[in-house]
Structure formats: C-alpha cells, structure tokens
C-alpha cells in the first residue's frame, strides 16, 4: 500500500501544480476586468505613433481597450538603451523608479532574436511594417537617381537613429560633411518643407505624417547593406503567462482590422497602413 499511496500523492501534487501553473493565464485577465482599465505602455516622443499630441499607438490603445470593454490607462515611458530594457520595465517587472509594468506594451519589434532573448514576454500581433525612406525636395533634386543625387547637399537625420547610423556610414562617409543632426525626424522634415534641406532620411511613417502627400517632395526607398529592404514589423507584448490577455488582444486587433478601423486610425495621422 505504501507505494500506491506515494503514487496517488504524487499524482495529486502534480495536478495541483498544473492548476497553479495554469492559473495566471486567466488570473491576469480577471484582474484587468476587475480593475476596469487596460494599462497600455507607449513610447514617449515617438511621433506619429505616440507623443504629447496623441498618435497612432495612442489611438490603437484606446480602440483595443474599448473592444475589451475597458477604459484606457495610458503609460507613456522613455525608451531605454535596448528594447529588452523596455520589456523588463514595462511588461514583466516594472521600473525601479516605481512605474510599470503595464498590461500590454505597443510598438514592440516582432523579431526572432528579440523573442529568443526575452523569454518572460509574449511578442505577438504585428500591426505595422516600418521602413526607412528618403524624402527629398524636387526643386533641389529635379532628377532623382539614387542617394548619390543628393551628394554635396544637406540631408537631415534624427540623432541616435537608424537613419543617422546608415547615412553617416554610407560610402565610407562621403555624405558625412553634409549630414545635419536634429533632435527629432519631425524637426528635420519641417526644415525640408521650409527649403532648408535637400532631403531627410527617416522612417516612412515619420515622413508621411509630416509631408502629407505634398507634391513638392518625393519619397524613395534607398538600399543600404546593413538594412533589410522589407523593414521590420511592430506588434505588442504581454507577460508570458498572460495567454488569455494575448488572445483577447489578438482577437480585438483582428476585428479592428476587418472593420477598417485600423486603416482609419493610420489615415488620421497621414500614414499609409502597411500590413506586416
């Protein structure tokens, strides 16, 4: 009788353990519904997606919350040195200064390497594909024939950005002397509109939101060896165990896309939606 009792006890313990391990999947969603609010983390100063004036991600966050029958509690936060830092601070642990974590974080790169390095989060539901583009003045460059068409002319980029790294290193630095660094891509694009620059290298979304189909400017894809031509997808992230929340958000996003609401959100900010 001794060994059967041990096996029985072991079976009960494993069953209890399984219940304990599976509980958080619904416990997170239950807790959120009890609170009445969906806490959504968005980056600060990332126009046109999120800024003091709102943005695409802010509108998506509001639409997702409404789909789930909840109020929106927005948590804007400054970007860390790496996306992994942001996932730790805003998704699974919280910041040492006392804010976070949120229920879900938006604008997370849907990348296999990032997923592999961050096993405490679930990255899912890509909703946009970002790319780098060159905006240029047709007056300054009446005939565009690649990036070399702007050689010797001033080109604006945002500080500490992919565009800045690419342009400063292109062609052994042949554009370096004419690169102008700006606090944000929006400011660079505003100077392009004012005739102070010949071109701006920036994210496609940034360019579209500022230029708004202005016929005086062209937008072109420029090939860089260190940049994938297809760009990168962005989506959401929740805690790994929050499976019910992830499923609910995935379903809500699918409904927003099918109804055309996602397209309308992007259109309000002058950006063409690009499905990942």
Question: Where do the protein language model's features map onto the residues?
Answer:
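Extended ligand-binding regions for polar small-molecule ligands
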Residues: 58-67, 138-141, 148, 153-154, ...
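N-terminal signal peptide c-region/cleavage motif recognized by signal peptidases
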Residues: 18-23
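Acidic, polar ligand-binding/catalytic clefts
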Residues: 75-148
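Ligand-binding cleft/hinge of the Venus flytrap
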Residues: 62, 66-71, 75-76, 125-128, ...
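Short loop->beta-strand "edge-of-pocket" segments that line small-molecule binding or catalytic clefts
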Residues: 37-44, 145-163
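Periplasmic-binding protein-like
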Residues: 43, 128-133, 204, 212-253, ...
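Extracytoplasmic small-molecule ligand-binding "clamshell" domains
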Residues: 30-103
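A ligand-binding cleft/hinge motif common to bilobed small-molecule-binding domains
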Residues: 104-117, 166-170, 193-194, 198-230
């Amino acid at each position: 009788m001794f060994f059967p009792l041990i096996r029985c006890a072991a079976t009960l313990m494993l069953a209890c353990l399984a219940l304990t391990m599976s509980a958080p999947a619904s416990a997170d969603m239950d807790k959120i519904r009890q609170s009445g609010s969906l806490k959504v983390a968005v980056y600060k100063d990332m126009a046109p997606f999120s800024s003091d004036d709102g943005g695409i991600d802010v509108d998506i966050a509001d639409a997702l919350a409404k789909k789930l029958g909840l109020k929106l509690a927005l948590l804007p936060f400054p970007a860390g040195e790496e996306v992994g830092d942001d996932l730790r601070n805003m998704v699974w642990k919280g910041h040492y200064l006392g804010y976070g974590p949120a229920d879900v974080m938006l604008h997370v790169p849907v990348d296999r390497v990032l997923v592999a390095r961050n096993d405490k989060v679930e990255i899912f539901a890509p909703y946009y594909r970002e790319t780098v583009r060159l905006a240029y003045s047709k007056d300054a460059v009446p005939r565009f024939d690649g990036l070399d068409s702007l050689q010797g002319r001033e080109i604006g980029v945002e500080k500490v950005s992919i565009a800045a790294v690419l342009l400063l290193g292109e062609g052994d630095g042949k554009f370096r002397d004419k690169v102008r660094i700006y606090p944000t891509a929006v400011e660079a694009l505003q100077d392009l509109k004012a005739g102070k620059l010949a071109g701006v290298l920036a994210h496609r979304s940034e360019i579209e939101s500022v230029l708004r189909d202005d016929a005086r400017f062209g937008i072109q894809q420029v090939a860089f060896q260190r940049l994938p031509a297809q760009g990168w997808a962005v989506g959401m992230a929740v805690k790994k165990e929050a499976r019910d929340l992830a499923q609910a958000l995935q379903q809500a996003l699918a409904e927003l896309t099918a109804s055309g609401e996602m397209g309308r959100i992007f259109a309000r900010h002058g950006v063409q939606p690009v499905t990942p």
